[in-house]
Amino acid sequence: MSVRLVLAKGREKSLLRRHPWVFSGAVARMEGKASLGETIDIVDHQGKWLARGAYSPASQIRARVWTFDPSESIDIAFFTRRLQQAQKWRDWLAQKDGLDSYRLIAGESDGLPGITIDRFGNFLVLQLLSAGAEYQRAALISALQTLYPECAIYDRSDVAVRKKEGMELTQGPITGELPPALLPIEEHGMKLLVDIQHGHKTGYYLDQRDSRLATRRYVENKRVLNCFSYTGGFAVSALMGGCSQVVSVDTSHEALDIARQNVELNKLDLSKAEFVRDDVFKLLRTYRDRGEKFDVIVMDPPKFVENKSQLMGACRGYKDINMLAIQLLNEGGILLTFSCSGLMTSDLFQKIIADAAIDAGRDVQFIEQFRQAADHPVIATYPEGLYLKGFACRVM
């Protein structure tokens, strides 16, 4: 008999709406013992079967749902089916947009909670972010090897969130050759170098692909400031869009060096690109105090908020940095501003920008809205999957 997680009375509603998480407060009791990440059945207070998921005794998310089908076992065949379903959409997208790199698995939205897989050419980069994902590591890798025999698999599960579920951080090759120090990929006509082994996340922010392309419409003959530039994807796109100058700012010398290489790789005019290693908050104030002006500013900061207790502080940070950006823009200038914090809703982010404009003493028009690229889908029953949001704003 399987181990069962029994919900408290009235706490089954979210599962009936097919939300994939069970929080600790919804649990009445466990029937049987389960190890970290083990597959369990989830039932209501009367014993009616609801879902099958992975158990995580130390996490606020006590279980993550693998399936709502009582006949479905969680095995190699299960992961093979999920991967094949996800690949159909990515195949179409890759053909339409000419991509050689994309997000293959976007966690809960692809029916595989806690699992992220990015494909860069013939390298699959894996992140296992939950206890259930780690427990099923062998089955998942077996399915990947069968479906993608041409691909090497590299583990980038070196993320702090694993500690919340009692797991060690892991990184390194799983199968096949080691990725090169810098792997070239193609995106909307750009060639970009990706550091799979040491870069942020899985090596590159694929989710901003369409936003980088959209930048080109605003930059012709304009002076552009690219904040939190990382390896320069927005800078390369701005140069391809015909900007007169782009200044890229980041705290990482290594990231800026790759950004410079990306400009050269695309045979763009390096004299139009400036690379500044500095703290963005500090530099924006310096620019303001000495009267610097820009026509377009890209503001793509790292995540400011990890949990609800940090939300108010994050709001202040977003407001401050966008206020400074608005002050630096010429009349009619464009601010392209983003938040990758899942707890930051689009409505709240828009309000923060509006408040920043008021504090800056400028009027702002919202002219375009952004979200993560189409290979990062959001399943309707899991709205938390929409984590990246952005706006193009015209400053009056």
Curated annotation (Swiss-Prot):
GO cellular component, one term: cytoplasm
Signal sequence range: none
Stored PROSITE patterns: PUA
Disulfide bonds: none
Protein location: Cytoplasm
Family of the protein in this entry: Belongs to the methyltransferase superfamily. RlmI family.
Stated name of the protein: Ribosomal RNA large subunit methyltransferase I
Upper lineage: Bacteria, Pseudomonadati, Pseudomonadota, Gammaproteobacteria, Enterobacterales
Gene: rlmI
